[in-house]
């Protein structure tokens, strides 16, 4: 097993990772609420925790990876009504779109993708345990709420006391609650809501609150105490704080050993926001950029750092990834099994073992590319392909990548080949001015030509 230190949000420091069960890792990541297309922020969560999943496996662990799907909540009910369709029709469609986006980004499907609506009995069971322990109460409006002041550890993830939270956090005002920080476990049904959004319970018809969904699904699939829980930084409070209160309140055991949170996505140095009009779906981005470029761009930043999205940064990522593929295009590395005793691999593993430091790990890839360009080393090419593969990169044929690229270049492969043939004819006819003109025309269109021995010409997108 590779040595691994992870920044634990709960401890506010890097800590050695020691799995509860030797050689095995149980990991849960908060997934999508499926009522709309996935955006760039979702892409970061997908790719970051796919990277974590891949590295844990590469390090020799047997990983059970769970990422939930929220398929019932207020936004889903509202959107289905606006569209004139059932909740099931809406969520099934957007689950499919989510899977398509994740696959495009090279994300390995989690071992389990529980849907909230399939785990309502487990949620009701957990709520019943909380009520029996005096941690939950039914309010006058019919909702069942969690009493935060009854849980001694509330605030330990966010590092704030109840007084700090009451003073500084925006919480919903509700006269039926005993405390403004109390949160809903079971939402009482409204007459106007569709039947498919309601389940029977001893507290009356209703549906689960968002927070109880993750507690019930994670504990059901991974046990009441597991290794890693991840999600975006925006979920740290209140969602993850509330998960701890629910899960530890119900079981009386520690819930999660390591809490991981990826940083925010910023658009041109501003926070991504629909209200600012700087909100991009994954599908919009993939119209202009190859999906592997987007994955490379996300992994180029440390997962806890802010990620600044811009066309300029994506263009830089495209050029950088092109450098790596170019180094591999004339090599035949054969297999891609990594020699972990080799110096580059040791540096790569050391970086990944330091809280998944992908920027440093990726710098090792460029060192290998330089060695390949300098020496033509097949061993270096094999290391480059193998190490990059642990990040889900460089898994395609180099020529396929190099001749792909942006979909809005305005010049097709067929047009490129036609111009190359015309240039070859011009050279045979010793019309070198015309041959140079065609090369310049292609270069202006972002196409780089490389004349090979024997008269062949290869091309790639710049």
UniProtKB/Swiss-Prot annotation:
GO cellular component: cytosol
Binding site residues for Zn(2+): 30, 214, 239, 243
InterPro entries given in the database record: Cys-tRNA-ligase (IPR015803), Cys-tRNA-synt_Ia_DALR (IPR015273), Cys-tRNA/MSH_ligase (IPR024909), CysS_C (IPR056411), Rossmann-like_a/b/a_fold (IPR014729), tRNA-synt_1_cat_dom (IPR032678), tRNAsynth_Ia_anticodon-bd (IPR009080)
Reaction catalyzed: tRNA(Cys) + L-cysteine + ATP = L-cysteinyl-tRNA(Cys) + AMP + diphosphate
Enzyme class, UniProt record, top EC level: ligase
Pfam assignment, any one: tRNA-synt_1e
GO molecular function: ATP binding; cysteine-tRNA ligase activity; zinc ion binding
Keywords: Aminoacyl-tRNA synthetase, ATP-binding, Cytoplasm, Ligase, Metal-binding, Nucleotide-binding, Protein biosynthesis, Zinc
Domain of life: Bacteria
Catalytic activity, EC: 6.1.1.16
GO BP term, example: cysteinyl-tRNA aminoacylation
Keyword Signal in record: no
Subunit structure: Monomer.
PANTHER family recorded: CYSTEINE--TRNA LIGASE, CYTOPLASMIC (PTHR10890:SF3), CYSTEINYL-TRNA SYNTHETASE (PTHR10890)
Membership in a protein family: Belongs to the class-I aminoacyl-tRNA synthetase family.
Protein's name according to its UniProt entry: Cysteine--tRNA ligase
């Amino acid at each position: 097993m590779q040595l691994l230190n992870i920044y634990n949000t709960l401890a506010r420091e890097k800590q050695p990772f020691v799995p509860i069960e030797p050689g095995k890792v149980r990991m849960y990541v908060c997934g999508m609420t499926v009522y709309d297309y996935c955006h760039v922020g979702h892409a970061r969560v997908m790719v970051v925790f796919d990277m974590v999943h891949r590295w844990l496996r590469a390090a020799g662990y047997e990983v059970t990876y769970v990422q939930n799907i929220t398929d019932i909540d207020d936004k889903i009910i509202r959107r289905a009504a606006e569209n004139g369709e059932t909740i099931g029709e809406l969520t099934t469609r957007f689950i499919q779109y989510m899977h398509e986006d994740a696959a495009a980004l090279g994300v390995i499907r989690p071992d389990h993708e529980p849907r909230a609506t399939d785990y309502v009995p487990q949620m009701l069971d957990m709520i019943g345990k909380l009520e029996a322990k005096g941690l939950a109460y039914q309010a006058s409006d019919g909702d069942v709420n969690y009493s935060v002041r009854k849980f001694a550890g509330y605030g330990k993830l966010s590092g704030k006391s109840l007084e700090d939270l009451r003073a500084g956090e925006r919480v919903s005002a509700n006269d039926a609650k005993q405390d403004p920080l109390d949160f809903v476990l079971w939402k009482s049904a409204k007459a106007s809501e569709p039947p498919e959004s309601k389940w029977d319970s001893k507290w009356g018809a209703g549906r689960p609150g968002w927070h109880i969904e993750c507690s019930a699904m994670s504990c059901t699939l991974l046990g009441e105490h597991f290794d890693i829980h991840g999600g975006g930084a925006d979920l740290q409070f209140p969602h993850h704080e509330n998960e701890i209160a629910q899960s530890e309140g119900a079981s009386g055991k520690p819930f999660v050993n390591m809490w991981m949170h990826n940083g925010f996505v910023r658009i041109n140095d501003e926070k991504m926001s629909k209200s600012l009009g700087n909100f991009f779906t994954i599908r919009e981005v993939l119209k202009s950029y190859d999906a592997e470029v987007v994955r490379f761009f996300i992994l180029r930043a440390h997962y806890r750092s802010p990620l600044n999205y811009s066309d300029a940064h994506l263009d830089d990522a495209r050029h950088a990834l092109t450098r790596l593929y170019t180094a591999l295009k004339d090599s035949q590395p054969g297999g891609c099994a990594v020699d972990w005793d080799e110096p580059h691999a040791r540096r790569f593993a050391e970086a990944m073992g330091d809280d998944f430091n992908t920027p440093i790990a990726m710098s090792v890839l460029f060192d290998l590319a330089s060695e390949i360009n300098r020496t033509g080393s097949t061993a270096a090419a094999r290391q480059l392909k193998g190490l990059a593969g642990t990040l889900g990169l460089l898994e395609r044929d180099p020529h396929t990548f190099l001749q792909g690229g942006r979909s809005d270049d305005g010049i097709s492969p067929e047009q490129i080949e036609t111009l190359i043939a015309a240039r070859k004819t011009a050279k045979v006819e010793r019309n070198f001015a015309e041959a140079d003109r065609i090369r310049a025309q292609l270069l202006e269109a972002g196409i780089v030509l490389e004349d090979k021995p024997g008269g062949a010409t290869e091309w790639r997108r710049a």
